[in-house]
Every structure is written in structure tokens, then in C-alpha cells.
């Protein structure tokens, strides 16, 4: 008998992943916070709020009961925003059976503690559960995966058996999964690419051109690499799907929420106004603060992240931030 799978979070990505698994004939239950959304998905087989236009698999079950979604499950996919992950895990802890595989598909750094999601998991859950933690990350817009456009991602875990299990479950003709053991690197790549996407969006909103965006992506990758190495990551990870791959997609794609927020900032809108218009979470807004604080604490030079933080939280004019980046003291490219 196959694994029973719960997916926690019915936003665009959670719904897409649940549907991918259910289309393979797997036993999948999708949890949504909103009872009315659960009722709608049961009645129409469509998540019109977060994934309109995609028909959901006939075998996919829906619930707003965490117990129903999590109790007795062999695999639990976590797709809640990173800033509420601790709260969600705390509620899930008494429901989880020993040996369950946890798959984190959220990207961020906890603001209060500056922990990555695997660190939050280790702090909240007993070792028997936290040890089978896997991160699923890479360049993957939900809408394109839902439309079965070819996509490649990474499943990273210190437990190679867990990574292989996640690879097997999620692999589909249009969804290729590679394994990796560098959890820290994959988590940092997924979190920081959203911050650099804000910078790329600001640049686009200011009309600064392709040269500027390319410079931000490349130097943003250097910042990702520096912080990752300081935290014990393998630098090679950042040349892969969870690093450069996700960074390029999020900094250039029109479906990128973080790039969209940045563009509107560059065009002169206020952050509160932008966020008030959004239905889904742009993780980079909170991650900009947590990443900048983490870099400061660890003594890591991250000037782009610093300027994004200042534009978001200190009302620094976007053009001034760009000028300050361009007039920093000259230095060697590496180092």
C-alpha cells in the first residue's frame, strides 16, 4: 500500500504540489485554513482563490482539520508561509507519527530567531520526526507546474533515504527531482533569491535596463554564496537549481511575486499599499529583514540585501540605494 500524504497549505504552490501527487494516483489530503475554500474545492474541483483555471484531480481530498490532514500520514508537505511555520509545526507535533517524512516547500528565514526552516523544525519537533526533514526547492512557478510545463527542482535532506523517497513521490514526466544532502545551502538559496528578486524588481521599476538586472543577479548570487558558506553550506549548491536556477527565475519572471513588489516600489508605490493589494505572500519582504540581521550578526558583507532592507523599512529612496551600491569602494570581484 502506498504512502498517505498530507499537504499543509492550499495556496498556489501547496495546491499545485497536492494536485501533482494526486494525479499520480497517490493518497493525498490538502489542508486549507479557510472552510469556505475547502467547500469550494470539494464542490468545483478548482481553487479559484489561488490557482484558478486548474482542474484538481478527482482523488484529491480536502479538509480544514489539521488532525485529518496530518494524523497517521507517512509524508507531510509543509507549504505555509515561513513566518508562521513554527506555529503550524507546534500544532502538528502531537499529530505526527514517528518516522514521518516532512517536506518543506516554503522559503524564508524566521524573523524572531533568524532560523532556517530546518532549524525551526529541529527546535519544535522530536528527533524521531525532525530527522526526516527534506527541503523541496528550485525554479518552479506554481502556475507553470500546474500546466505541466517541464520543471526541475531539488529535494535536499541529511537523510538520503528521505530525499530519495521525496524524489520518487514527486517525480513526474514534467517534474524532475534531483537529490542533494546540503539542506542549509538549499534553504539559504531559496530564501535569499526572494530578496534579490526585490532588488531586480526595483531596478526594473526604475527603468534601469538589462545590464543593471544582470549585475544584481550576479552580485546577489555572491551574497547568497557568502552567507551560505558562513553557515556551513556547500558553495556548489548555489550554482545549481536551488541557487542560480531559482534566482534567475525569480528575478526575471513575470509570475514572480517578489519581483512584482520590487517593481511597484521602483515605480514609487508605498510598501503598505503594495502588500494591501496582494492576496498571496511575498516572502522576500520579511526575509529581507531576517537575512540582513543574520548577515550583520555573522559579519557577512551583503550590500544588496542591506539596500533592499533600507528601501523597505527605512524609506530610503530606491534611486539613492542604487547610487550607493554603485559608488561603494572599488574591490576585487571575488572575496
Curated annotation (Swiss-Prot):
Supply the Gene3D superfamilies for this chain.
N-(1-d-carboxylethyl)-l-norvaline Dehydrogenase, domain 2, NAD(P)-binding Rossmann-like Domain
User: Which Gene Ontology molecular-function terms are recorded?
Assistant: glycerol-3-phosphate dehydrogenase [NAD(P)+] activity; NAD binding
Question: Kind of enzyme, top EC level?
Answer: oxidoreductase
One Pfam annotation reads NAD_Gly3P_dh_N
User: Per UniProt, where does sn-glycerol 3-phosphate bind?
Assistant: 107, 138, 140, 193, 246, 256-258
Disulfide bonds, which pairs? none
- Residue ranges the record marks as coiled coil: none
| Catalysis performed (reactions) | sn-glycerol 3-phosphate + NAD(+) = dihydroxyacetone phosphate + NADH + H(+); sn-glycerol 3-phosphate + NADP(+) = dihydroxyacetone phosphate + NADPH + H(+)
Compartments reported by the entry: Cytoplasm
Keyword match Nucleotide-binding: yes
Query: What pathway annotation does it carry?
Result: Membrane lipid metabolism; glycerophospholipid metabolism
Family indicated by similarity: Belongs to the NAD-dependent glycerol-3-phosphate dehydrogenase family.
Q: What is this protein called?
A: Glycerol-3-phosphate dehydrogenase [NAD(P)+]
Q: Which organism is it from?
A: Geobacter metallireducens (strain ATCC 53774 / DSM 7210 / GS-15)
Please name the taxonomic classification of the source.
Answer: Bacteria, Pseudomonadati, Thermodesulfobacteriota, Desulfuromonadia, Geobacterales
Amino acid at each position: 500500500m502506498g504512502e498517505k500524504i498530507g499537504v499543509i497549505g492550499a495556496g498556489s504552490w501547496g495546491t499545485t504540489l497536492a494536485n501533482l501527487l494526486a494525479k499520480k494516483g497517490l493518497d493525498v489530503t490538502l489542508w486549507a485554513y479557510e472552510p469556505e475554500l475547502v467547500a469550494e474545492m470539494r464542490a468545483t474541483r478548482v481553487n479559484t482563490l489561488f490557482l484558478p483555471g486548474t482542474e484538481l484531480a478527482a482523488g484529491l481530498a480536502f479538509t480544514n482539520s489539521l488532525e485529518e490532514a496530518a494524523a497517521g500520514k507517512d509524508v507531510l508537505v509543509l507549504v505555509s508561509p515561513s513566518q508562521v511555520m513554527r506555529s503550524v509545526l507546534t500544532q502538528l507535533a502531537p499529530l505526527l507519527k514517528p518516522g514521518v517524512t516532512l517536506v518543506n516547500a516554503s522559503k524564508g528565514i524566521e524573523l524572531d530567531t533568524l532560523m532556517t526552516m530546518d532549524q525551526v523544525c529541529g527546535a519544535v519537533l522530536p528527533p524521531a520526526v525532525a530527522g526526516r526533514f527534506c527541503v523541496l526547492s528550485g525554479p518552479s512557478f506554481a502556475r507553470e507546474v500546474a500546466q505541466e510545463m517541464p520543471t526541475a527542482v531539488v529535494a535536499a535532506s541529511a537523510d538520503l533515504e528521505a530525499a530519495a523517497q521525496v524524489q520518487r513521490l514527486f517525480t513526474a514526466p514534467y517534474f524532475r527531482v534531483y537529490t542533494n544532502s546540503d539542506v542549509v545551502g538549499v534553504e539559504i538559496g531559496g530564501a535569499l533569491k526572494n530578496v534579490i528578486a526585490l532588488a531586480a524588481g526595483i531596478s526594473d521599476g526604475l527603468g534601469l535596463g538589462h545590464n543593471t538586472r544582470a549585475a544584481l543577479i550576479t552580485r546577489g548570487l555572491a551574497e547568497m554564496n557568502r552567507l551560505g558558506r558562513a553557515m556551513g553550506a556547500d558553495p556548489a549548491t548555489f550554482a545549481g537549481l536551488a541557487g542560480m536556477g531559482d534566482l534567475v527565475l525569480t528575478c526575471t519572471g513575470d509570475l514572480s511575486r517578489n519581483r512584482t513588489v520590487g517593481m511597484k516600489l521602483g515605480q514609487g508605490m508605498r510598501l503598505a499599499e503594495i502588500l494591501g493589494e496582494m492576496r498571496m505572500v511575498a516572502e522576500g519582504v520579511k526575509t529581507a529583514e531576517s537575512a540582513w540581521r543574520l548577515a550583520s550578526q555573522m559579519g557577512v558583507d551583503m550590500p544588496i540585501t542591506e539596500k533592499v532592507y533600507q528601501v523597505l523599512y527605512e524609506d530610503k529612496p530606491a534611486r539613492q540605494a542604487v547610487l550607493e551600491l554603485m559608488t561603494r569602494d572599488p574591490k576585487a570581484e571575488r572575496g
